[in-house]
Regions:
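Non-catalytic positions within long, well-ordered alpha-helices that form the structural scaffold/packing
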Residues: 80-83, 104
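Conserved catalytic-core motifs of GNAT/GCN5-like acyltransferases
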Residues: 109-126
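Conserved GNAT acetyl-CoA-binding A-motif
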Residues: 82-95
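Conserved acyl-donor/pantetheine-binding loop and adjacent beta-alpha core of acyl/acetyltransferases
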Residues: 5-58
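Conserved active-site alpha-helix within GNAT-family acetyltransferase domains
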Residues: 96-114
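Conserved glycine-rich acetyl-CoA-binding loop
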Residues: 62-73, 85, 101
Length: 158
């Protein structure tokens, strides 16, 4: 089940939903959708989606299926189901260039840009706004505003 297999039951118990793309009888990719607080390890921040909002996270494409549009298909599927279930906005982050291309072509718009580095137990982060209205809303769910941040690095498994 992979390195995070032991976390699946806890995620499902707190209301997270897991989605998968299947090809030839095997999982080609998967991702999670949460409407409650979640830890974003790359940013060292917690996101708390608002009412009728969700957070798409921990999306993975199996190596053998990379560059086949799996991630984009996953995002479109999650978005359609979330909309059907009454969610009005989804938040997602990306730390990889190929993923960023899929995020944009799946209907997501950039709100914030992050530059981060972790060295010697410290986490430095610079956050800049991409869209004034979206960045204000993103700051609300992340409880931060554009600028520089320096904090102790924290590792959390969730």
């Amino acid at each position: 089940m992979g390195p995070e297999g032991d976390l699946v039951a806890a995620r499902l118990a707190r209301g997270c939903r897991c989605f998968a793309v299947w090809m030839d009888g095997q999982v080609a990719g998967y991702g999670w959708l949460s409407t409650g607080p979640e830890w974003i390890g790359e940013l060292q921040l917690e996101i708390t989606p608002g009412s009728a909002e969700g957070y798409v996270w921990n999306c993975v494409t199996v190596d053998a299926h990379r560059r086949k549009g799996i991630f984009r298909s996953l995002l479109i599927g999650i978005s359609e189901i979330a909309r059907r279930d009454g969610l009005k906005r989804l938040w997602i982050g990306s730390v990889a260039i190929p993923a960023e291309k899929a995020v944009g072509s799946s209907g997501f718009q950039p709100a914030l840009h992050f530059t981060t580095v972790t060295v010697g137990g410290l986490h430095a982060m610079r956050m800049t706004a991409r869209d004034p209205k979206l960045s204000q809303d993103a700051g609300r769910v992340l409880r931060v505003q554009p600028g520089w941040y320096l904090r102790r690095s924290r590792r959390r498994r969730h």
